[in-house]
């Protein structure tokens, strides 16, 4: 879904081509080079430097803070590097509290949504990157790595949430906060930035953006169009309301937004065939691709994702694409084929 400025906002993805390792590597590589798409930049809005979430499920924090950094840059001309770990610290405690309150019926995981970042800024403020320990450094790494962190934290939260006790104590919160602080750092009450002292709240207010100016927009038919509803996915655990508009209007909003200089925090799905870590997702017509690639249905479904991507990439610009419809989008959401597994910052066309 999209966290968007009320008036306008953003979009675009870029694609490279992935290569594959197989007996036909040379042949496939030649085909890829011949058919490689060439992209023309139509619009590229200003963004801050790209950060690496590494082995942490914090795409929602990195992408949405990047979005807000772009908003600040557009509005004030100033470049900031805001702390993802500050937002993660606050959000994980809130999510654990909700999981316990709901006796485990709200999931507890590394993931989140763009709204989690907006909520954190509104309720807890924000700090610059250097006001917290650098991601990964508290565990001897140079980048965030949440493997051990959540191996410890998840069963801790589940033990409390699924407790058979008739009454639980409040001690679990201080214990959990200690775990969070140990792995990603304590959140400061005060800090100095460019010679001036701030609290997280006063620093957030100094950034020059109005946090009430942002909304979430989506498009599904199981709720009335032009109404608001909470999108039913696990990482949308705060249940914020999204404006529901037809898919065609959603696309128009994006096109209009990016061409007017805005960017967007986008929550989407990168698990479909045709989306690789090195490229842009292309909505391939899989039935036609199977035929063009000389692969029958049974063999196609037995191929690994990387093997499928090699075949898809070899077709390149000749690969047939579907024309997405509102019904396709809805069907894929209803049957779990499409979900909300990755947050991105879209900034151009």
Features from the language model and the residues they span:
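Boundary at the C-terminal end of the N-terminal hydrophobic targeting segment
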Residues: 20-25
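Catalytic-core signature of thiol
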Residues: 26-349
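Positively charged n-region of N-terminal signal peptides that target proteins for export
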Residues: 1-7
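Sec-dependent N-terminal signal peptides
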Residues: 7-16
């Amino acid at each position: 879904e999209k966290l968007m400025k009320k008036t306008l906002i953003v979009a675009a993805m870029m694609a490279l081509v992935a290569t594959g390792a197989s007996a036909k590597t040379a042949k496939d590589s030649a085909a890829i080079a011949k058919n490689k798409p060439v992209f023309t930049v139509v619009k590229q809005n200003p963004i801050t430097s790209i950060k690496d979430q590494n082995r942490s499920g914090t795409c929602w924090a990195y992408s949405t803070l990047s979005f807000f950094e772009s908003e600040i840059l557009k509005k004030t001309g100033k470049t900031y590097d805001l702390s993802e770990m500050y937002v993660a610290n606050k959000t994980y405690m809130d999510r654990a509290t909700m999981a316990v309150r709901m006796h485990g019926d709200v999931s507890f995981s590394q993931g989140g949504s763009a709204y989690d970042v907006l909520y954190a800024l509104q309720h807890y403020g924000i700090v610059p990157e250097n006001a917290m320990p650098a991601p990964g450094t508290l565990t001897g790494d140079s980048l965030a790595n949440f493997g051990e962190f959540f191996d410890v934290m998840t069963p801790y939260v589940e033990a409390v949430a699924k407790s058979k006790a008739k009454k639980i104590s409040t001690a679990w919160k201080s214990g959990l906060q200690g775990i969070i602080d140990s792995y990603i750092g304590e959140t400061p009450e005060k800090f100095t930035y460019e010679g001036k002292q701030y609290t997280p709240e006063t620093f957030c207010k100094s950034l020059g953006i109005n946090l009430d100016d942002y909304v979430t927009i989506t498009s599904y038919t199981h709720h009335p169009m032009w109404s608001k509803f909470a999108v039913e996915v696990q990482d949308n655990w705060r249940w914020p309301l999204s404006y529901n508009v037809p898919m065609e209007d959603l696309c128009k909003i994006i096109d209009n937004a990016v061409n007017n200089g805005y960017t967007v925090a986008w929550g989407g799905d990168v698990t479909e065939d045709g989306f690789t870590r090195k490229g842009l997702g292309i909505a391939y017509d899989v039935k036609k691709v199977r035929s063009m690639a000389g692969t029958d249905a049974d063999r196609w479904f037995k191929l690994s994702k990387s093997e499928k991507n090699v075949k898809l990439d070899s077709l390149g610009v000749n690969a047939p694409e579907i024309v997405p419809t509102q019904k396709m989008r809805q069907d894929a959401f209803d049957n779990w084929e499409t979900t909300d597994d990755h947050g991105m910052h879209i900034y151009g066309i």
